[in-house]
Amino acid sequence: MGLLGAAIVAGLAAVGGAIAVAIIVKSTIEGVTRQPELKGTLQTLMFIGVPLAEAVPIIAIVMGFLIMGNA
């Protein structure tokens, strides 16, 4: 059961991270097309937001490894 739980955690974390990054990039592109003069600011915010969105899946994958280690 532990290996299955670890696989589910890793899979859901990867999907969640991909969706979060896609939403952040989509919103940044929409913002730049509406207001091109804010490109630098929006790009900076995107470069801050993407690692924050990826931190949660990385933590979840580490938790999956911990679950796998205890199995």
Curated annotation (Swiss-Prot):
Keyword line: ATP synthesis, Cell membrane, CF(0), Hydrogen ion transport, Ion transport, Lipid-binding, Membrane, Transmembrane, Transmembrane helix, Transport
Recorded superkingdom: Bacteria
MF-aspect GO terms: lipid binding; proton-transporting ATP synthase activity, rotational mechanism
Record text on subunit structure and interactions: F-type ATPases have 2 components, F(1) - the catalytic core - and F(0) - the membrane proton channel. F(1) has five subunits: alpha(3), beta(3), gamma(1), delta(1), epsilon(1). F(0) has three main subunits: a(1), b(2) and c(10-14). The alpha and beta chains form an alternating ring which encloses part of the gamma chain. F(1) is attached to F(0) by a central stalk formed by the gamma and epsilon chains, while a peripheral stalk is formed by the delta and b chains.
Compartments in which it is found: Cell membrane
Transmembrane segments: 5-25, 47-67
Record-stated family: Belongs to the ATPase C chain family.
Main location: membrane
Membrane topology designation: Multi-pass membrane protein
Gene Ontology cellular component annotations, sorted alphabetically: plasma membrane; proton-transporting ATP synthase complex; proton-transporting two-sector ATPase complex, proton-transporting domain
Annotated protein name in UniProt: ATP synthase subunit c
